[in-house]
């Protein structure tokens, strides 16, 4: 299994040299801390649920050897039913199919997979397991959940990002409206590391020993004109507990011109808040987009509380009004970006299993910037006047929520 960023966080741009760019600084930092940086990759952004599932299903249809899926949850709905039907067809063709989901994620889902569903899925030849099944006294299983979203097909194609398996990524939800999210399709050397993450978790949970060259095929060399540099930063609670937090903080510290963040549950840890404040002090433009509504009660209030603090320090805060923005992305200096599963809150950064791709490519970064600029048109800029209009109760709830996290 690959090593990612070590626990010890030592990062300074002071010695980086006057000519060093933010992307080169962060890339070197990730290398020094043990994150796998690969150079032979191609990335495609999947900006809607429709885009993700069309792309995913098409590539599953062409699978020849294996399909691996690791999700926080599979919601028992039309998308999951279509997916498992397709996977069952692939099993008949001789393709190995392994699927894993988080037991708590399933339990907290309003349409969970129940034992009868799992029995039916397994009867079709699909291997499917729960990560860390919930047993009495329950509370022992509340932390260290598997929040990753990873798919690997034939060891050649990989997916990660913010979307689980559910039809509301396409249809939205009555309470919050349209769902906005971000996923990526990867091909190239970085897929090997997604595969390593999946197989490590699978073998640990099942006691199996799946592995070998068939799961890590050689990748085709891409032309330099399209090859993209990617670091897969994986968080595991014991081995690399601060990996994603440090990668975010390092990226924010290294920024020289601009930082743009979109995150649905924005209650960042102190180290990330400090990095943002330091960036503002040195004149870096910081723009943060958070949803005005959420699928989790009280979350917007806690996010608004933190956002208001950062607004007073000079950050531009946008409240997205076009539904629920569940994307977990950051763009730095129009040169590199991250897309992944980690929320900027204590749950993701201190407890859960998470995976983010740091993509060192201006083209992909500016595609995300263009999306950000479109979404600004459907957002409200947080100002002192907007803040004053919030009720005292909402401000109090935000303060309590921030205190609890």
Model-inferred region functions:
Residues 2, 6-405:
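Charged, low-complexity intrinsically disordered terminal segments
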């Amino acid at each position: 299994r690959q090593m990612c960023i070590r626990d010890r966080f030592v990062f300074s741009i002071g010695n980086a040299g006057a000519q060093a760019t933010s992307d080169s600084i962060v890339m070197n930092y990730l290398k020094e801390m043990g994150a796998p940086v690969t150079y032979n990759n191609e990335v495609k952004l999947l900006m809607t649920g429709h885009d993700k599932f069309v792309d995913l299903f098409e590539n599953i249809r062409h699978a020849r050897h294996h399909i691996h899926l690791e999700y926080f949850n599979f919601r028992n709905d039309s998308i999951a039913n279509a997916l498992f039907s397709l996977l069952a067809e692939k099993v008949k063709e001789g393709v190995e199919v392994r699927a894993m989901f988080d037991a708590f994620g399933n339990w907290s889902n309003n349409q969970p997979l129940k034992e009868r569903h799992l029995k039916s899925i397994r009867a079709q030849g699909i291997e499917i397991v729960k990560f860390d099944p919930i047993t009495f006294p329950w509370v022992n299983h509340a932390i260290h959940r598997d929040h990753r979203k990873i798919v690997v097909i034939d060891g050649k194609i990989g997916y990660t990002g913010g979307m689980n398996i559910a039809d509301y990524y396409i249809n939205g939800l009555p309470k919050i409206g349209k769902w906005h999210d971000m996923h990526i399709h990867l091909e190239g050397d970085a897929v090997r590391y997604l595969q390593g993450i999946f197989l490590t978790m699978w073998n640990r949970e099942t006691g199996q020993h799946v592995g070998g060259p068939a799961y890590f095929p050689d990748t085709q060399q891409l032309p330099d004109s399209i090859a993209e540099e990617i670091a897969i930063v994986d968080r595991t609670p014991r081995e690399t507990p601060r990996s994603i937090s440090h990668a975010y903080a390092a990226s924010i510290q290294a920024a020289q011109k601009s930082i743009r963040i979109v995150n649905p549950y924005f209650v960042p840890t102190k180290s990330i808040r400090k990095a943002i404040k330091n960036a503002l002090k040195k004149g870096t433009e910081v723009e943060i987009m958070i949803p005005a509504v959420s699928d989790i009660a009280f979350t917007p209030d806690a996010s608004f509380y933190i956002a208001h603090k950062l607004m007073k320090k000079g950050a531009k805060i946008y409240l997205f009004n076009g539904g629920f923005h569940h994307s977990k992305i950051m763009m730095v200096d129009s040169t590199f970006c991250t897309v992944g599963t980690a929320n900027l809150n204590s749950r993701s950064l201190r407890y859960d299993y998470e995976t983010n791709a740091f993509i060192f490519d201006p083209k992909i970064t500016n595609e995300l910037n263009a999306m950000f600029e479109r979404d600004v048109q459907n957002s409200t800029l947080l100002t002192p006047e907007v803040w004053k209009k919030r009720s005292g109760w909402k401000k109090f709830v935000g303060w309590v929520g921030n205190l609890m996290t």
